[in-house]
Amino acid sequence: MAEDACRIDVWLWRARFCKTRSLAAKLADEGRVRLTRGGAESRIDKASRTIRPGDELVFALGGRLTAIRIEALGERRGPPAEARTLYAPLDPPAA
């Protein structure tokens, strides 16, 4: 895997959107995450799908729609303050 890419399940866990990597993998495997890269939108259906800084993700979590832009991949699952530096919130798309 390239240095500038990371698996979606690992990144969701590092960014603290999921408590465990297994839950992050389940979110991806169920097709509940949308990825926008270079203007092309696709549904993520595998936990092994790679993401890069600049990609945008949209997913439902905790009954809320979450839209973010990936700013960094991170090296570890750090404290919440460190996790918040991995992404920038976006306005969710209109339903």
Where are these regions (language model features)?
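Strongly charged
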Residues: 2-10, 14, 25-26, 34-95
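Hydrophobic ligand-binding cavity/cleft-lining segments
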Residues: 31
